[in-house]
């Protein structure tokens, strides 16, 4: 599930798994969707399922070719699965009584919020601004790099990482926020302050808004 597809201000993509016992009403509802007519989990994934209500999708799939149906009851053991299993999984799927059904669903959510919509446009304490002497360090952290490294055991390898936008664009949702936000590191957001035009990190209230909380949520006084 991609958070920006459902009106959030983060480009945050996460995999969610919802499981339940076969003695529950959820199980009864799910098995009823695997009827003789459909022979797959399309109704459950797109209309009746737990995620379909919380994160609705369109009735048409993204690509008719991106549909997978697998019956693990046709395999004798895990070795047989390893030797014969060939299938692709997509952004939605369900497993019911050994049968897997997966498809590429199209989110039917809301337009994402943009980072610029939650940014404070006013007087900001100078402690949030990036000092001139730190600018090159920030550029290095955000930039692409390839570094030859050697582990403690003597194993040599190449460490590489791609670039991150610096500063973060205000006309897009923000990147995934980590717990290290606000510190001097590669993952912290750095924006152009709307009022001064100078680079700064996010304010606590801006971080609250990015995570879906009201302003002042973390203010303990």
Which positions does each model-derived feature cover?
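Polybasic, glycine- and aromatic-enriched phosphate-binding surface used to engage nucleic acids
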Residues: 132-212, 216-218
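Class I S-adenosyl-L-methionine
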Residues: 1-166
């Amino acid at each position: 599930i991609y958070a920006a597809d459902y009106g959030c201000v983060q480009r945050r993509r996460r995999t969610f798994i919802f499981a339940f016992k076969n003695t529950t009403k959820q199980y009864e509802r799910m098995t009823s969707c695997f009827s003789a007519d459909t022979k797959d989990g399309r109704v459950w994934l797109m209309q009746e399922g737990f995620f379909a209500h919380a994160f609705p999708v369109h009735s048409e799939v993204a690509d008719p070719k991106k549909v997978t149906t697998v019956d693990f009851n046709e395999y004798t053991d895990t070795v047989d699965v390893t030797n014969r299993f060939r299938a692709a999984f997509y952004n939605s799927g369900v497993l019911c009584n050994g049968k897997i059904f997966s498809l590429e669903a199209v989110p039917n959510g809301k337009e994402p919020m943009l980072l610029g919509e939650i940014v404070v446009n006013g007087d900001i304490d100078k402690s949030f601004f990036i000092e001139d002497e730190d600018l090159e360090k920030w550029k290095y952290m955000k930039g692409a790099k390839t570094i030859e490294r050697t582990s403690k055991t003597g194993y040599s390898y190449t460490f590489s990482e791609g670039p991150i936008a610096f500063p973060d664009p205000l006309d897009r949702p923000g990147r995934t926020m980590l717990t290290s936000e606000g510190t001097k590191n590669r993952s912290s957001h750095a924006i152009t302050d709307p009022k001064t035009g100078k680079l700064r990190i996010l304010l606590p209230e801006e971080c609250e808004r990015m995570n879906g909380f009201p302003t002042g949520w973390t203010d303990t006084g």
